[in-house]
């Protein structure tokens, strides 16, 4: 088959343990189906020579388009606040020196602030949400020789000059898209080309917030997953060095939790993948020796009928084919406390599920109200659902991790203490407690705090380790455009990093902490460590401040995780958390059915 041209796809992530850039397999599948050659340049395994790797490639190849995936903007860990976008920019700057090909960025992290990042990176294009269809349309336009002012692809973000990024609206917007603010909006800056789309009044709807992106996703084809092939994602190497493979069953989320980026970044409707396509992909991965697969859905049990059907197909193939590689599958899933019934638990176990990570977040109903909600704003579970889920998992032989997140508005010592005590009573395999919330522009909580600030005042609890003064957020319609609105959550007025976070000012901190823009909630961290008896801390993940503990529960460059991988353990890292001290000390532990040495 004669190829129409080459698209280079770059993974700039250099965080370890490594996580396979699943998105690049998705894009590669779509581009190849559309007649293009896709070359993956994976810099994760080139920490010291990534510049030379890029130089060698672009000296030999002339791609018509370069795509860059940005999985995370930062660690999103409020007690650390470590940005990644500066590293991505360094990679992009090097690419710009080596090729004249236009650059398009995407990825879930990118999608949380796409206008600001197109501007910050100085690139031509961006994609918010699933990118497999849009990148093919863009590659096709470039292959046809269309000039920049003739490229109007629905969903594509276009850089029209410094401080001026526009988005080509899809032909039919979600009717539930957020309405324009009632106050008079500022107009978008005029585009530089008269043939560009006419700007619409600045509103959340105008920038594509609260919009379905199901039309952007490929749902019927199995994504091609490879190992050991040049210029492709090496999934087996990632498994050997990172301990997990990945599988997506659906995109988007119909829920509206106030501290979540999924409905905005991936869309407000589920784009459910075909059952056969997903299970074919899982079978291909396990056949390559990648036996531990973790779902990458926002939550696996949302749209539970689809998830049950998928599990039934896995079970059918495992039971009816003695040679099926799915018999070696160990599945790890993210779930919300509800919906989750006995049938679902039994299907998970029969399909080879090893563990369930439960995003319970809290036990108190007054904390969950307005936080963990449906699109209509109603809470969709209570703590009894969490209790039942843990019991069902343990009854069916599956490990559990239950997570709580402290620091939302209204959090007090009483609510935090009660949550700790009740979650410890669950006797989950591991219980994880986090403190503080990293704010991203289109979260419900972030929009609410911007509304309270109204561009003229700060709000107690707004915090950044690098803040040099009070943090005053503007609402979208008060900004010159979406770039300014999004940037304020990552940068200060001088352009320096200032990752904006939130900690409840009602927690018992030292005087002045909640009123200080760079205050550190030390007393709350200390309380959590003191509340858990030392005899129970082996099964608990606790928040840490720099230097406060060797048991850091943040993923990026985590010494425990990297030690696990060097020793050949696989599966979700929390499954080995109870044995962390022995593993870190170098003790040789028997490798059970939930941990396998990759040979």
Curated annotation (Swiss-Prot):
Enzyme Commission code: 2.1.1.106
InterPro entries linked: B12_rSAM_trp_MT, Cobalamin-bd, Elp3/MiaA/NifB-like_rSAM, rSAM, rSAM_horseshoe, Tetrapyrrole_Bchl_Biosynth_MTs
Binding site for [4Fe-4S] cluster: 253, 257, 260
Domain (Radical SAM core): residue spans on this chain: 239-492
Cofactor(s) this protein cannot do without: [4Fe-4S] cluster; cob(II)alamin
Any one GO molecular function term: cobalamin binding
Signal peptide: none
EC category: transferase
Keywords from the named record: 4Fe-4S, Antibiotic biosynthesis, Cobalamin, Cobalt, Iron, Iron-sulfur, Metal-binding, S-adenosyl-L-methionine, Transferase
Keyword flag RNA-binding: no
Record field: transmembrane: none
Biased composition (Low complexity): 168-181
PROSITE patterns (UniProt xref): B12_BINDING, RADICAL_SAM
Stretches assigned to the B12-binding domain: 4-149
SMART domains per record: Elp3 (SM00729)
Annotated stretches, region: Disordered: 167-197
Cofactor note: Binds 1 [4Fe-4S] cluster. The cluster is coordinated with 3 cysteines and an exchangeable S-adenosyl-L-methionine.
Resulting phenotype, residue 260 to A: Loss of methyltransferase activity
Catalytic activities: L-tryptophan + S-adenosyl-L-methionine = 2-methyl-L-tryptophan + S-adenosyl-L-homocysteine + H(+)
One of the GO BP terms on file: antibiotic biosynthetic process
Task performed by this protein: Involved in the biosynthetic pathway of the antibiotic thiostrepton A. First, TsrM catalyzes the transfer of a methyl group from S-adenosyl methionine (SAM) to cobalamin, leading to the formation of methylcobalamin (CH3-cobalamin) and S-adenosyl-L-homocysteine (SAH). Then the methyl group is transferred to the C2 position of tryptophan (Trp) with the concerted action of the radical SAM [4Fe-4S] center, leading to the production of methyltryptophan.
Extra remark: TsrM has a totally new mechanism among methyltransferases and radical SAM enzymes. TsrM is not able to use methylcobalamin directly but instead coordinates free cobalamin. SAM serves exclusively as a methyl donor and not as a radical source, and the methyl group of SAM is not directly transferred to tryptophan.
The protein's name in its UniProt record: Tryptophan 2-C-methyltransferase
Organism from which the protein derives: Streptomyces laurentii
The gene coding this protein: tsrM
